[in-house]
Amino acid sequence: MMLQNEGFAWEDQKRGQFREDFFPPIDIPVVPYKPWVLKNIPIPPGLYLEVCRIIKQKIKAGVYEPSNSLYRSRWFCVLKKDGKSLRLVHSLKPLNEVTIAHSGVPPATETLAAQFAGQACGRMLDLYVGYDKRTLSESSRDLTTFQTPFGALRLVTLPMGWTNSVPIFHNDVTFIL
């Protein structure tokens, strides 16, 4: 690993994305619907500055971009497992309700893990914030728009919590392996 250290991203600004010639941008398939505008959950005053810092960081990393869309989904923040850091969570319920579900079935992780039982050494593929490696098509990004203190923003990458994200990302990892 030390020989290839420069190939790893240790900061948000240095991480890349999957090559679009191997992983084309995702189109979100939807049934006919009416656009949605949901009122946002207020940011707690004590977390406001930290939430703004995280949003700016995601803009700089290319995960969020400005939007003029007529959609607005909710978002909120939760504590990560470390009990200190915050994670922004996008409530994609309205999008999931109109999405045509992917036919893929996620793998049985227990079966996969059992194959490594008793092994002296295992391998690990760590895709630093993996969903952020796969881009959404321009035509689908507006469906992910949400309101922030910096105006309307939309996701540029595969949304965590979207109905089809797990099977799509599973296919991506399978292709890589």
Model features per residue range: what roles?
Residues 96-104, 131-143:
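Cytochrome P450 core scaffold surrounding the K-helix E-X-X-R motif
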Residues 27, 91, 126-128, 161, ...:
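Catalytic palm active-site di-aspartate
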Residues 13-16, 64-66, 166-177:
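Active-site palm subdomain of RNA-directed nucleic acid polymerases
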Residues 82-96, 112-133:
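Conserved catalytic palm subdomain of right-hand nucleotidyl-transferase polymerases, strongest
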